[in-house]
Protein backbone atom coordinates (compact mmCIF):
# COMPACT_ATOMS: atom_id res chain seq x y z
CA UNK A 1 0.00 0.00 0.00
CA UNK A 2 1.50 3.32 -1.01
CA UNK A 3 1.93 6.02 1.63
CA UNK A 4 0.62 8.77 -0.66
CA UNK A 5 -2.15 7.26 -2.82
CA UNK A 6 -3.64 10.58 -3.92
CA UNK A 7 -0.28 11.96 -4.94
CA UNK A 8 0.69 8.78 -6.75
CA UNK A 9 -2.64 8.71 -8.59
CA UNK A 10 -2.28 12.35 -9.58
CA UNK A 11 1.26 11.72 -10.79
CA UNK A 12 0.17 8.72 -12.87
CA UNK A 13 -2.62 10.76 -14.45
CA UNK A 14 -0.18 13.59 -15.14
CA UNK A 15 2.18 11.25 -16.97
CA UNK A 16 -0.66 9.86 -19.09
CA UNK A 17 -1.95 13.37 -19.82
CA UNK A 18 1.53 14.41 -20.94
CA UNK A 19 1.87 11.45 -23.29
CA UNK A 20 -1.64 11.88 -24.69
CA UNK A 21 -1.35 15.67 -25.03
CA UNK A 22 2.13 15.67 -26.56
CA UNK A 23 1.06 15.82 -30.25
CA UNK A 24 -1.49 18.58 -29.59
CA UNK A 25 0.95 20.80 -27.70
CA UNK A 26 3.87 20.20 -30.04
CA UNK A 27 1.63 20.92 -33.02
CA UNK A 28 0.54 24.20 -31.42
CA UNK A 29 4.15 25.16 -30.77
CA UNK A 30 5.15 24.18 -34.29
CA UNK A 31 2.37 26.34 -35.72
CA UNK A 32 3.72 29.37 -33.86
CA UNK A 33 7.12 28.73 -35.40
CA UNK A 34 5.59 28.18 -38.83
CA UNK A 35 3.61 31.41 -38.67
CA UNK A 36 6.23 34.14 -38.79
CA UNK A 37 6.28 36.88 -36.16
CA UNK A 38 5.51 39.35 -38.94
CA UNK A 39 3.20 39.21 -41.95
CA UNK A 40 6.17 38.60 -44.25
CA UNK A 41 6.53 35.30 -46.09
CA UNK A 42 9.93 33.67 -45.56
CA UNK A 43 10.17 31.00 -48.29
CA UNK A 44 13.52 29.46 -47.35
CA UNK A 45 12.21 28.81 -43.82
CA UNK A 46 8.65 27.88 -44.89
CA UNK A 47 7.22 30.52 -42.58
CA UNK A 48 4.40 32.94 -43.18
CA UNK A 49 1.01 34.21 -41.95
CA UNK A 50 -2.02 32.10 -41.11
CA UNK A 51 -4.18 30.82 -43.99
CA UNK A 52 -1.43 31.49 -46.52
CA UNK A 53 0.53 29.21 -48.83
CA UNK A 54 4.29 29.46 -48.30
CA UNK A 55 6.40 27.81 -51.00
CA UNK A 56 10.08 26.90 -50.83
CA UNK A 57 11.94 28.16 -53.89
CA UNK A 58 15.04 26.04 -53.48
CA UNK A 59 15.59 22.36 -52.82
CA UNK A 60 16.19 21.78 -49.14
CA UNK A 61 19.55 20.66 -47.80
CA UNK A 62 20.71 19.18 -44.48
CA UNK A 63 21.11 22.78 -43.26
CA UNK A 64 17.31 23.06 -43.05
CA UNK A 65 16.52 22.09 -39.45
CA UNK A 66 12.83 22.97 -39.05
CA UNK A 67 11.81 19.54 -40.36
CA UNK A 68 13.63 16.29 -39.82
CA UNK A 69 14.92 14.57 -42.98
CA UNK A 70 13.34 16.87 -45.61
CA UNK A 71 13.09 15.67 -49.19
CA UNK A 72 15.63 16.86 -51.73
CA UNK A 73 13.61 15.84 -54.79
CA UNK A 74 10.47 17.87 -54.05
CA UNK A 75 9.70 21.53 -53.43
CA UNK A 76 7.51 22.13 -50.40
CA UNK A 77 4.42 24.31 -50.01
CA UNK A 78 2.88 24.60 -46.54
CA UNK A 79 -0.01 26.38 -44.85
CA UNK A 80 -1.51 26.60 -41.36
CA UNK A 81 -5.30 26.96 -41.52
CA UNK A 82 -7.81 28.32 -39.01
CA UNK A 83 -11.29 27.25 -40.14
CA UNK A 84 -13.32 28.65 -37.24
CA UNK A 85 -14.59 31.69 -39.15
CA UNK A 86 -15.17 30.08 -42.55
CA UNK A 87 -13.83 27.44 -44.95
CA UNK A 88 -10.66 28.01 -46.92
CA UNK A 89 -10.46 27.32 -50.65
CA UNK A 90 -7.37 26.00 -52.39
CA UNK A 91 -6.72 25.88 -56.12
CA UNK A 92 -4.57 23.06 -57.47
CA UNK A 93 -3.30 23.65 -61.01
CA UNK A 94 -3.07 21.04 -63.76
CA UNK A 95 0.03 19.08 -62.79
CA UNK A 96 0.54 17.68 -66.31
CA UNK A 97 1.80 14.32 -65.08
CA UNK A 98 4.11 15.69 -62.38
CA UNK A 99 4.28 13.98 -58.98
CA UNK A 100 2.49 15.97 -56.28
CA UNK A 101 0.81 15.44 -52.94
CA UNK A 102 -0.88 17.62 -50.35
CA UNK A 103 -0.91 16.07 -46.89
CA UNK A 104 -3.63 17.28 -44.48
CA UNK A 105 -3.02 17.00 -40.72
CA UNK A 106 -5.50 17.82 -37.98
CA UNK A 107 -4.67 19.38 -34.60
CA UNK A 108 -3.86 15.94 -33.19
CA UNK A 109 -1.32 15.47 -36.07
CA UNK A 110 -3.45 12.74 -37.64
CA UNK A 111 -3.36 12.58 -41.43
CA UNK A 112 -7.04 12.81 -42.36
CA UNK A 113 -6.76 13.04 -46.15
CA UNK A 114 -4.41 13.46 -49.10
CA UNK A 115 -4.88 15.36 -52.34
CA UNK A 116 -2.47 13.78 -54.78
CA UNK A 117 -2.00 12.13 -58.14
CA UNK A 118 -3.06 8.86 -56.50
CA UNK A 119 -6.30 10.20 -55.03
CA UNK A 120 -7.32 12.82 -57.61
CA UNK A 121 -5.25 12.43 -60.75
CA UNK A 122 -3.41 15.33 -62.37
CA UNK A 123 -6.29 17.61 -63.39
CA UNK A 124 -6.88 21.16 -62.16
CA UNK A 125 -9.24 21.34 -59.17
CA UNK A 126 -10.70 23.67 -56.54
CA UNK A 127 -11.22 22.38 -53.00
CA UNK A 128 -13.03 23.88 -50.00
CA UNK A 129 -11.61 22.81 -46.64
CA UNK A 130 -14.45 23.06 -44.09
CA UNK A 131 -14.12 23.04 -40.33
CA UNK A 132 -16.28 21.03 -37.92
CA UNK A 133 -19.91 22.06 -37.95
CA UNK A 134 -19.88 23.92 -41.26
CA UNK A 135 -23.07 22.98 -43.08
CA UNK A 136 -23.42 25.82 -45.57
CA UNK A 137 -23.73 25.24 -49.30
CA UNK A 138 -20.62 25.61 -51.43
CA UNK A 139 -20.40 27.32 -54.82
CA UNK A 140 -20.54 25.11 -57.88
CA UNK A 141 -17.23 23.58 -58.85
CA UNK A 142 -15.80 23.23 -55.34
CA UNK A 143 -14.94 19.82 -53.96
CA UNK A 144 -15.56 19.58 -50.21
CA UNK A 145 -13.12 18.26 -47.62
CA UNK A 146 -14.33 18.15 -44.01
CA UNK A 147 -11.60 18.67 -41.45
CA UNK A 148 -12.05 16.96 -38.06
CA UNK A 149 -10.54 19.93 -36.18
CA UNK A 150 -10.74 23.72 -36.70
CA UNK A 151 -6.99 23.96 -37.25
CA UNK A 152 -5.24 22.17 -40.10
CA UNK A 153 -1.68 21.91 -41.39
CA UNK A 154 -1.13 21.34 -45.11
CA UNK A 155 2.18 20.01 -46.42
CA UNK A 156 2.44 20.08 -50.19
CA UNK A 157 5.22 18.41 -52.17
CA UNK A 158 5.89 18.81 -55.91
CA UNK A 159 8.35 16.50 -57.63
CA UNK A 160 11.51 18.06 -59.05
CA UNK A 161 13.64 16.32 -61.67
CA UNK A 162 16.93 18.00 -60.80
CA UNK A 163 17.99 21.67 -60.52
CA UNK A 164 17.08 22.48 -64.14
CA UNK A 165 13.46 21.52 -63.39
CA UNK A 166 13.06 23.97 -60.50
CA UNK A 167 11.74 26.91 -62.63
CA UNK A 168 8.91 24.73 -63.98
CA UNK A 169 7.86 23.89 -60.42
CA UNK A 170 8.02 27.58 -59.49
CA UNK A 171 5.47 28.23 -62.24
CA UNK A 172 3.11 25.65 -60.72
CA UNK A 173 3.60 27.11 -57.25
CA UNK A 174 2.64 30.53 -58.62
CA UNK A 175 -0.63 29.06 -59.91
CA UNK A 176 -1.60 27.68 -56.50
CA UNK A 177 -4.11 29.70 -54.52
CA UNK A 178 -5.38 29.65 -50.95
CA UNK A 179 -7.99 32.04 -49.61
CA UNK A 180 -11.26 32.38 -47.67
CA UNK A 181 -14.50 31.09 -49.12
CA UNK A 182 -16.02 34.58 -48.87
CA UNK A 183 -13.36 35.87 -51.25
CA UNK A 184 -13.34 32.96 -53.67
CA UNK A 185 -15.24 34.75 -56.47
CA UNK A 186 -12.55 37.42 -56.81
CA UNK A 187 -9.66 35.27 -55.55
CA UNK A 188 -9.15 37.43 -52.48
CA UNK A 189 -6.38 36.33 -50.13
CA UNK A 190 -6.83 36.02 -46.38
CA UNK A 191 -6.00 38.97 -44.17
CA UNK A 192 -2.46 38.38 -42.87
CA UNK A 193 -2.48 37.05 -39.32
CA UNK A 194 0.45 35.91 -37.24
CA UNK A 195 0.69 33.58 -34.27
CA UNK A 196 0.12 34.97 -30.81
CA UNK A 197 2.57 33.99 -28.05
CA UNK A 198 1.22 31.26 -25.82
CA UNK A 199 1.69 33.33 -22.67
CA UNK A 200 2.41 30.21 -20.65
CA UNK A 201 5.72 29.84 -18.84
CA UNK A 202 7.10 27.80 -15.99
CA UNK A 203 7.06 24.08 -15.21
CA UNK A 204 3.32 23.69 -15.88
CA UNK A 205 3.35 25.46 -19.25
CA UNK A 206 2.95 22.22 -21.18
CA UNK A 207 -0.27 21.31 -19.37
CA UNK A 208 -1.63 24.86 -19.58
CA UNK A 209 -0.99 24.96 -23.33
CA UNK A 210 -2.64 21.58 -23.72
CA UNK A 211 -5.77 22.62 -21.83
CA UNK A 212 -6.01 25.84 -23.86
CA UNK A 213 -5.74 23.94 -27.13
CA UNK A 214 -8.29 21.31 -26.10
CA UNK A 215 -10.92 23.96 -25.39
CA UNK A 216 -11.08 24.68 -29.13
CA UNK A 217 -10.99 21.07 -30.33
CA UNK A 218 -13.89 18.66 -30.83
CA UNK A 219 -13.78 15.52 -28.74
CA UNK A 220 -11.90 12.55 -30.10
CA UNK A 221 -12.44 9.00 -28.83
CA UNK A 222 -9.32 9.31 -26.67
CA UNK A 223 -10.42 12.65 -25.28
CA UNK A 224 -13.89 11.29 -24.51
CA UNK A 225 -12.26 8.52 -22.47
CA UNK A 226 -10.27 11.09 -20.50
CA UNK A 227 -13.42 13.09 -19.81
CA UNK A 228 -15.09 9.97 -18.39
CA UNK A 229 -12.06 9.46 -16.15
CA UNK A 230 -12.21 13.09 -15.08
CA UNK A 231 -15.88 12.82 -14.09
CA UNK A 232 -15.13 9.65 -12.12
CA UNK A 233 -12.31 11.33 -10.21
CA UNK A 234 -14.43 14.39 -9.52
CA UNK A 235 -17.14 12.22 -7.99
CA UNK A 236 -14.64 10.26 -5.91
CA UNK A 237 -12.80 13.34 -4.64
CA UNK A 238 -15.71 15.81 -4.47
CA UNK A 239 -15.65 15.90 -0.66
CA UNK A 240 -11.92 16.51 -0.46
CA UNK A 241 -11.58 19.98 -1.95
CA UNK A 242 -10.04 20.71 -5.36
CA UNK A 243 -9.21 17.76 -7.57
CA UNK A 244 -5.53 16.94 -7.65
CA UNK A 245 -5.37 16.51 -11.41
CA UNK A 246 -1.62 16.87 -11.48
CA UNK A 247 -0.20 16.84 -7.97
CA UNK A 248 3.31 15.92 -8.93
CA UNK A 249 5.02 16.95 -12.13
CA UNK A 250 8.49 15.50 -12.47
CA UNK A 251 11.41 17.09 -14.22
CA UNK A 252 15.12 16.79 -13.71
CA UNK A 253 17.51 19.64 -13.05
CA UNK A 254 21.13 19.73 -14.22
CA UNK A 255 22.22 17.46 -11.37
CA UNK A 256 19.58 14.89 -12.30
CA UNK A 257 17.58 15.35 -9.11
CA UNK A 258 13.80 15.21 -9.17
CA UNK A 259 11.68 18.21 -8.26
CA UNK A 260 7.94 18.11 -7.73
CA UNK A 261 5.37 20.81 -8.51
CA UNK A 262 1.79 20.91 -7.37
CA UNK A 263 -1.17 22.09 -9.45
CA UNK A 264 -4.74 22.27 -8.19
CA UNK A 265 -7.52 22.13 -10.73
CA UNK A 266 -11.01 22.78 -9.41
Please place each PLM-identified region on the residue numbering:
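A compositional/structural signature for long, glycine/proline-rich flexible linkers
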Residues: 1-266
